[in-house]
Swiss-Prot record:
It comes from Homo sapiens. GO terms for cellular component: centrosome; cleavage furrow; cytosol; dynactin complex; kinetochore; midbody; nucleolus; perinuclear region of cytoplasm. The lineage of its organism: Eukaryota, Metazoa, Chordata, Craniata, Vertebrata. This is Dynactin subunit 3. Part of the dynactin complex that activates the molecular motor dynein for ultra-processive transport along microtubules. Together with dynein may be involved in spindle assembly and cytokinesis. The keyword Cell division applies. It is found in: Cytoplasm; Cytoplasm, Cytoskeleton, Microtubule organizing center, Centrosome; Chromosome, Centromere, Kinetochore; Cytoplasm, Cytoskeleton, Spindle.
Amino acid sequence: MAGLTDLQRLQARVEELERWVYGPGGARGSRKVADGLVKVQVALGNISSKRERVKILYKKIEDLIKYLDPEYIDRIAIPDASKLQFILAEEQFILSQVALLEQVNALVPMLDSAHIKAVPEHAARLQRLAQIHIQQQDQCVEITEESKALLEEYNKTTMLLSKQFVQWDELLCQLEAATQVKPAEE
């Protein structure tokens, strides 16, 4: 009975294919898609019987279909001993994950606290404070640059004063030396 319904489904699919190829009321004449499919099947059979590589490929296609079957994994199920070895090999990792999950579980009440729930209410205030902070950072940069310029001016002035004092000291030494020489002439 099931074979009959499969045959009917196949025949319906071939008729639908003929409608696609020839159109809904197409002039197909005596030509049928099934005849063309049979010819293709015979040609492929002839080719495969002549070529050894094609025979090997046909055998591999059957294996590939078998391996792609989702139930294949269930048929070659892993023994319980192997599953146990997998679990034991990952024991330390599993225990560390359990400890982390317990920590998260312990911290859940803190996430539900009133302080965390009030965060959206404080968002506008936080944004205003962030803007003030940015303005203060800009002011700080300006003050730093002004201070740097003032320090450079101070250093230049100090350097010039030092040079001037050195020149005055040299001039004073020369004048003192000249005054000491004159009293010896008397």
